[in-house]
Swiss-Prot record:
Chain segments annotated as transmembrane: 31-51, 89-109, 114-134, 159-179
Official protein name in the record: Lipoprotein signal peptidase
Chain segments carrying region Disordered: 1-21, 189-216
HAMAP family: LspA (MF_00161)
Organism: Leifsonia xyli subsp. xyli (strain CTCB07)
Domain of life: Bacteria
Compositionally biased tracts (Basic and acidic residues): 207-216
Catalytic center residues: D149, D164
MF annotations from Gene Ontology: aspartic-type endopeptidase activity
Length: 216
């Protein structure tokens, strides 16, 4: 019996895969996400610092002012601790932690291509910068400055500021995106898994179609 020979089938090269190459659209999406992140962070930071300046200028420390009756009050305090007055005796530790987290956010930001993740990191960055500015430049000294807190809800014992609110919202958004399986590129992880599994049968089919070599 004659031997049937077929040309060897070449495996697809990973280098030529368009999914692995940086396309202009992905680059544009990355730049757009960074712009959103920067705008959100700047807005949070400015709102936080402006409201703190207004409180310091118009209220005395410890003063309380009703804004929405018993629902929301202004209560000016100087907080040497973390968010919601946690750890008031370790201001310098929170300053170092804030610098470290801030550096991580800036280092990780270029990987973001999702609008939702950009908003998340913008809220986190703006909030961190707001409170870190207080710790670095307010009294009693550099790195141990007291954070200006002024918002109080009777249902909560803590007094906080807009930077704290932004950080809490970023954590809530993080939980939501994580539970939904949305990655930094905006894609769901299960959708990516489905794409990989749908590509596998094609490779198996090509292997099955390859004729066997028979010898006499």
């Amino acid at each position: 019996m004659a031997t049937s020979r077929t040309a060897p089938t070449r495996a697809p090269s990973l280098r030529s895969s368009p999914a692995l190459e940086a396309s202009p659209s992905r680059t544009k999406a990355s730049v757009g996400a960074l712009v959103i992140l920067a705008v959100v962070a700047l807005c949070v930071y400015l709102m936080d610092q402006i409201t703190k300046a207004l409180v310091v200028s118009n209220l005395s420390e410890g003063q309380q002012v009703a804004v929405l009756g018993q629902l929301l009050q202004l209560h000016f305090v100087k907080n040497p601790g973390a968010a919601f007055s946690i750890g008031s005796g370790s201001t310098w530790i929170f300053s170092l932690v804030g610098v470290g987290v801030l550096g991580f956010v800036i280092w990780y930001a270029p990987r973001i291509r999702s609008t939702a993740w950009a908003i998340l990191f913008g809220l986190l960055l703006g909030g961190l910068l707001g409170n870190l500015t207080d710790r670095l430049f307010r009294e009693p000294g550099f790195g141990v400055g007291h954070v200006i807190d002024f918002l109080q809800i009777p249902l909560l014992t803590a007094i906080f500021n807009l930077a704290d609110v932004a950080i809490v919202f970023s954590m809530g958004l993080f939980l939501l995106l994580t539970l939904r399986g949305i990655g930094l590129d905006g894609r769901r992880q299960r959708d990516e898994g489905a794409g990989v599994s749908s590509a596998s049968p094609a490779g198996d089919e090509s292997a099955a179609d390859k004729p066997e070599n028979l010898s006499a």
